[in-house]
C-alpha cells in the first residue's frame, strides 16, 4: 500500500509517517518548503503546493490512500485569514478534485479539529458530532468546518477525524511560552496521547470500510477527562517545575471540552495510553542526568521564578 500524507512536516506529521512505515506501507509526502525531520529517504518526497492542481494531481497518482493533515494553524490563521482559507479550504478542495479525477475509490482520511464545536463551558454532556452543533469561534475552526462540509458534499469516500489537541512529541521552551497560557486552568480538556492519535489514523486507513462516510471524535476516552491545570501540572512536573500563578492564564473559555469517543473507540480500538505515559515518554527524550538535576535541584529552588518568566 502506498499512502500520501499531506502536512507531514508539521509537529505531528513525522509520527504519522513512521506509523505507516512500521506497518509496511510505502509513504509519499507532499511538501512545500520543509523536509520531514528524521525520515530521510524512508519516504518518497514530492515538492509542490497543496493549493495547485498540478502538484496535487502528481501527488495522488498511484496512491492507495490519502491522509490530509496540511493546514495553516493558529495563531497564523488569525493573522492571515485569506491564507488560511486558501490552504485549509482551497487545498482540501484541490485534493477532493484530484481524487475524484482518478476515477477509482480510495480512502481519504481528513484530520479535522474539535475546535469546530467552539467554546462550550455550559455543556452538560460530552460532545459528539451527531449530537452537538458546531459554533466555530476562530478563523482556524471556521476553515476546518468549511473543509469538512466540502468533503461531505463531494462524491469521494472519506472519513473525518475530529481530533482533540494532540501534544507534541517534544516540548520546547518556546512552545510552552507561546501556547501554555491561552487556556483557562479550569477548562475541561481530554488528553489524547500522540501514539493513540497516530494509531487512529492508521486504523482508519486499514479498516476504512467500517468508518467510511463517518465523522468521528478522536481523543483519550473517559479516563483522560481532566482540567487544563492537570495537563500543565503534569507536563511541567516532568521537569520539576511548579504550576505557574493563576493570573498568567486566560479567563475566557477555550474551545476544548470532554468528548464522547465511544463510537470511534469501538470501531478503531486506539485508546491505549494515558497522560502518565506521556509524562514518562517526555522525560525519556531528555538525558536522565538533566531530568534528575531539574527535579531535585533546579525545580525546587528556582522553579517558581522560572515559571513566572514564561
What is each residue range found by the language model?
Residues 3-23:
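N-terminal Rossmann NAD(P)H-binding glycine-rich loop of SDR-like oxidoreductase domains
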Residues 36, 47-87, 119:
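NAD(P)H-binding glycine-rich loop region in Rossmannoid oxidoreductase-like domains
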Residues 51, 83-94, 134, 138, ...:
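Glycine-rich NAD(P)-binding loop of the Rossmann-fold in SDR/ketoreductase-type enzymes
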Residues 72, 93-139, 159:
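Conserved Rossmann-fold NAD(P)-dependent oxidoreductase catalytic core, especially the SDR/UDP-sugar
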Residues 146-170:
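Conserved beta-loop-beta element that borders a ligand/cofactor-binding pocket
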Residues 154, 168-178, 204-216:
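Glycine/proline-rich active-site loop of Rossmann-fold NAD(P)-dependent oxidoreductases
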Residues 182-206, 214:
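Substrate-positioning beta->alpha
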Residues 200-261, 266-267, 279-281, 286, ...:
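Mid/C-terminal beta-alpha module of Rossmann-like enzyme folds, strongest
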